[in-house]
UniProtKB/Swiss-Prot annotation:
Gene: nimA
Name recorded for this polypeptide: G2-specific protein kinase nimA
Listed GO MF terms: ATP binding; histone H3S10 kinase activity; protein kinase activity; protein serine kinase activity; protein serine/threonine kinase activity
Species this chain originates from: Emericella nidulans (strain FGSC A4 / ATCC 38163 / CBS 112.46 / NRRL 194 / M139) (Aspergillus nidulans)
Assigned protein family: Belongs to the protein kinase superfamily. CAMK Ser/Thr protein kinase family.
InterPro entries listed in its UniProt record: Kinase-like_dom_sf, NEK_Ser/Thr_kinase, Prot_kinase_dom, Ser/Thr_kinase_AS
Phenotype for residue 41 to G: In NIMA7; block in G2
Catalytic activity: L-seryl-[protein] + ATP = O-phospho-L-seryl-[protein] + ADP + H(+); L-threonyl-[protein] + ATP = O-phospho-L-threonyl-[protein] + ADP + H(+)
Broad class of enzyme this protein falls into: transferase
Lineage: Eukaryota, Fungi, Dikarya, Ascomycota, Pezizomycotina
Length: 699
C-alpha cells in the first residue's frame, strides 16, 4: 500500500477525460520529467470472473503490442487496499474519431477524401499488426509494383492472433498531428489462428452478419467494422441504422446501404463496399487492403512524414547537444579564465608581498644608516657648540677684565679727542669683537578708527581718471626756455598721488595728551597707498629746525679748539649711562648730545672769521633767504658724516693712518661708539621739503 501510494505521488492529476467500460480515464503528468500520460483507473471489486479474465487479457495484449498506430502501454499500479488498478497509457491529445464525426455533422460538412484515405491506411496498418503479429513491410520506392506477401507470425506466436472485436469511432484515437492510435482492447481476445470466437461482444451498429447469425467471429469481422467506420466518416451516419434491435439485425443481414456522395472517388467507394459484403469470404483481408495502391501511397506519405519527423527530432536533439556542448565549452572557458586569473592574482600577490618585504628591508637599512649618521652629526655639532660656548665664555671674561681696567682711560680720551662720542668704523673692528645677532621683532601696527585692514594691493580702479592720456605733453619739457620743474596733474598717476593722504596716524590718541589729533573724515573717500610709488615723508613742526638767520648769527656747534672747553669735575649723568651695543647707532648727532658732550649747557661764541669769509657767509645767507632754504649747513652735514668728530681730527687720523704712525688698538681700548637714543634725543632731518602738512604731537 505504501508503495502504491508512493507511486501515486509521482503523478499529478490534470483533468478528467472520460469514462470507459470499467472505470475513469484521467490526464496526469509525471512529476519527474513533466511527461503527459493517460491513466485508466479500474475498480475490480464488482467485476465478475469473466470480466476479470478480460482485464487480464487486456494486460497481456497491451504489454505485447508496440506499434506507432496503437496506444502505447507503459506500466500499471495495483492498490490492494482499495482494489483499484491503474493503467498508464499513451495520451492522445487530438481526441477520438467520434468527435470528428460530430463536428462534421454539426457544421454540415463532409470529410475530405485525403483525410479519409489517411485514416483508413493507418487503421489497416494497426489491424495488420494485430492480425498477423508483425509490422507490414515498408512500401519503399516500389509503389506500383507487386505487393509482398505477408510473412505471418514466427516462433511461439506463429499460431496466435489478436481480434479487437470492439472497433468503433470511440476507440480510434487521434494524436496531435492526426496520427491514428487504436486503443481500448478490453474486449479483445487472443486466440489461435484456426479458432473462432463464438461470444457475442461489440457495439450493435458495427456487428457483422455472421455475428448476427450466431456464427463464429473471425478476422474478417474486424474488416466489416472498418467498412462501417469509413462509411460513417464519409456519410456522417452509420450504414445500418434502425429503431429496434431486430430491424437493425435484418438490415445488416441484407447488406443494403445508401450510396456515398458523388464527390468521393470510385476507388474509395469500391474499398468501402468490398468491406461491407455480407459473405465474409468475399471480404478482403488485412493484407489485401494494405496493398491497395491508394493505401500504399498513403502509407508512403506517412512513412515520409515519420522520417521527416524523426529527422526533425534528431536535428533538434543534435542542436540541443551542440548547444549543450557549446555551453559546456563556454563554461570550461570561463572556468579556465577564472583559474588563470586566480593563478595570476595569487602569483602577483606573492610577488607583491616579496617586493614589499624587500622594499621594507632596504628602507629599514637606509633608516638605520641615516639614524647612525644623524647621531654622529648631532654629536659633532654638540661638540662644536660646546667648544664655541667655551671660547665665548673665556672671551667675555677677558673682555670684562679689560673693560674694567681701562674705563677711566676711555672717558678721558673721549673728552679730549672730540666733543662727540667716537663712532666705530671698519678700521676699529677686530675678529675678537662680539657680534650682535639678536633679531628685533617688527612692531605690530595698530588700527586707527574708521579704517579697514589692508588685505589687497591697490589697483588702477582705485584712482580717478582725470584725462584719457596717461601723461601730459607739458611734462616732456619740449621748450628750452622752461626753467621750472615739469608737473602734470592730469594723468592718472599724478592724480592718484595728489589725492592720497600724505600721512595717516598709526596710533590713536589717548586722554593724557593735550592736543587732539586730526582724525580722518569718515565721509571722505580714502585711497590706499600705492605700493608701486615711494611713500612721501611728512614734515615735522617748524620750531624743531632752527632758521638759517638764527644759525648764521650763532657760532658753530662744534668748537674749533676742543681744549678750550671747560672740564667738568663731576661726570655727567647722561655720560654715565651705559650705551647698549645692541641699540641702533646714528652718525647724525642731535643738539642735546652736542651740548652735553661739550660740557656746557650753553653755546659759546666761536672765533671770528676773516672778512673774506664773512662776506662769503653773508652772500650765502642772502641766497638762503632768497631761496627760502632751511636746515643745517654743509659744514654740519660734513661733520655729521664724519661721525660727530671735527673735520680736522678726521683729516689728521687719515694722515696718520697713511703715514703708519698710528698703532692699532684693540676694541677694548678704543672709545665706545656714538649712540643716538630716539627716546631721549630729538633728531631733525635736513632732508625735508617745505609746503607739506605738519603732524603735531606725534610720538
Amino acid at each position: 500500500m505504501a508503495i502504491a501510494l508512493a507511486e501515486a505521488d509521482k503523478y499529478e492529476v490534470l483533468e478528467k477525460i472520460g469514462c470507459g467500460s470499467f472505470g475513469i480515464i484521467r490526464k496526469v503528468k509525471r512529476k519527474s520529467d513533466g511527461f503527459i500520460l493517460c491513466r485508466k483507473e479500474i475498480n475490480y471489486i464488482k467485476m465478475s470472473t469473466k470480466e476479470r479474465e478480460q482485464l487480464t487479457a487486456e494486460f497481456n495484449i497491451l504489454s505485447s503490442l508496440r506499434h506507432p498506430n496503437i496506444v502505447a502501454y507503459y506500466h500499471r499500479e495495483h492498490l490492494k487496499a482499495s482494489q483499484d488498478l491503474y493503467l498508464y497509457m499513451e495520451y492522445c491529445g487530438g481526441g477520438d474519431l467520434s468527435m470528428v464525426i460530430k463536428n462534421l455533422k454539426r457544421t454540415n460538412k463532409y470529410a475530405e477524401e485525403d483525410f479519409v484515405w489517411r485514416i483508413l491506411s493507418q487503421l489497416v496498418t494497426a489491424l495488420y499488426r494485430c492480425h498477423y503479429g508483425t509490422d507490414p513491410a515498408e512500401v519503399g520506392s516500389n509503389l506500383l509494383g507487386p505487393a509482398p506477401k505477408p510473412s505471418g507470425l514466427k516462433g511461439k506466436q506463429a499460431q496466435m492472433t489478436i481480434l479487437h472485436r470492439d472497433l468503433k469511432p470511440e476507440n480510434i484515437f487521434l494524436g496531435s498531428d492526426n496520427t491514428v492510435k487504436l486503443g481500448d482492447f478490453g474486449l479483445s481476445k487472443l486466440m489461435h489462428s484456426h479458432d473462432f470466437a463464438s461470444t457475442y461482444v461489440g457495439t450493435p451498429f458495427y456487428m457483422s452478419p455472421e455475428i448476427c447469425a450466431a456464427e463464429k467471429y473471425t478476422l474478417r469481422s474486424d474488416i466489416w467494422a472498418v467498412g462501417c467506420i469509413m462509411y460513417e466518416l464519409c456519410q456522417r451516419e452509420p450504414p445500418f441504422n434502425a429503431r429496434t434491435h431486430i430491424q437493425l439485425v435484418q438490415k445488416i443481414r441484407e447488406g443494403k446501404f445508401a450510396p456515398l456522395p458523388d464527390f468521393y472517388s470510385s476507388e474509395l467507394k469500391n474499398v468501402i463496399a468490398s468491406c461491407l459484403r455480407v459473405n465474409p469470404d468475399h471480404r478482403p483481408d488485412t493484407a489485401t487492403l494494405i496493398n491497395t495502391p491508394v493505401i500504399r501511397l498513403m502509407r508512403r506519405e506517412v512513412e515520409l512524414n515519420n522520417l521527416s519527423r524523426a529527422a526533425r527530432k534528431r536535428e533538434e536533439a543534435t542542436m540541443q547537444k551542440a548547444k549543450d556542448v557549446e555551453q559546456a565549452f563556454a563554461k570550461l572557458e570561463k572556468e579556465k579564465q577564472q583559474i588563470r586569473s586566480e593563478l595570476e592574482n595569487s602569483i602577483r600577490r606573492e610577488w607583491e608581498v616579496k617586493a614589499r618585504l624587500e622594499i621594507d628591508r632596504q628602507v629599514q637599512n637606509e633608516l638605520d644608516k641615516l639614524r647612525k649618521r644623524f647621531e654622529c652629526e648631532v654629536q659633532d655639532r654638540v661638540a662644536q657648540e660646546v667648544e664655541k660656548q667655551r671660547r665665548n665664555a673665556n672671551y667675555r671674561e677677558d673682555a670684562s677684565l679689560r673693560s674694567s681696567g681701562h674705563s677711566s682711560q676711555m672717558s678721558s680720551s673721549n673728552s679730549e679727542d672730540s666733543d662727540f662720542p667716537s663712532s666705530t668704523d671698519i678700521s676699529q673692528l677686530s675678529l675678537e669683537s662680539p657680534t650682535n645677532k639678536a633679531a628685533k621683532l617688527p612692531k605690530k601696527e595698530s588700527r586707527t578708527p574708521f579704517t579697514r585692514s589692508k588685505t589687497v594691493v591697490d589697483s588702477p580702479m582705485d584712482i580717478q581718471m582725470a584725462e584719457p592720456s596717461p601723461i601730459s605733453i607739458a611734462s616732456l619739457s619740449l621748450s628750452p626756455r622752461r626753467t621750472s620743474a615739469t608737473y602734470s596733474g592730469k594723468n592718472i598717476f599724478a592724480e592718484g598721488e595728489r589725492k592720497r593722504p600724505k600721512f595717516e596716524p598709526t596710533l590713536a590718541y589717548s586722554d593724557d595728551e593735550d592736543d587732539t589729533p586730526e582724525l580722518p573724515s569718515p565721509t571722505r573717500p580714502k585711497v590706499k597707498p600705492d605700493p608701486f610709488k615711494a611713500p612721501s615723508r611728512p614734515l615735522l613742526r617748524q620750531n624743531t629746525t632752527a632758521l638759517m638767520q638764527k644759525l648764521s648769527t650763532q657760532p658753530p656747534i662744534f668748537p674749533a679748539n676742543p681744549s678750550r672747553l671747560p672740564q667738568m669735575s663731576a661726570p655727567d649723568v647722561r655720560e654715565s649711562k651705559s650705551r647698549s651695543p645692541h641699540r641702533r647707532l646714528s652718525k647724525i648727532p642731535s643738539s642735546a648730545n652736542l651740548a652735553a658732550d661739550a660740557g656746557s649747557p650753553t653755546r659759546k661764541n666761536g672765533v671770528k672769521s676773516s672778512p673774506s669769509k664773512m662776506n662769503g657767509g653773508d652772500e650765502m645767507f642772502k641766497a638762503v633767504m632768497q631761496r627760502n632754504m632751511g636746515g643745517r649747513t654743509l659744514v654740519e652735514l660734513a661733520q655729521a658724516r664724519a661721525g660727530g668728530r671735527p673735520i680736522d681730527e678726521v683729516k689728521r687720523c687719515a694722515s696718520d693712518s697713511r703715514s703708519g704712525c698710528s698703532v692699532p688698538m684693540k676694541s677694548a681700548d678704543r672709545d665706545p661708539p656714538a649712540v643716538w637714543d630716539p627716546e631721549r634725543d630729538e633728531m631733525p632731518s635736513p632732508f625735508l621739503a617745505r609746503g607739506r602738512k605738519v603732524i603735531r604731537n606725534l610720538r
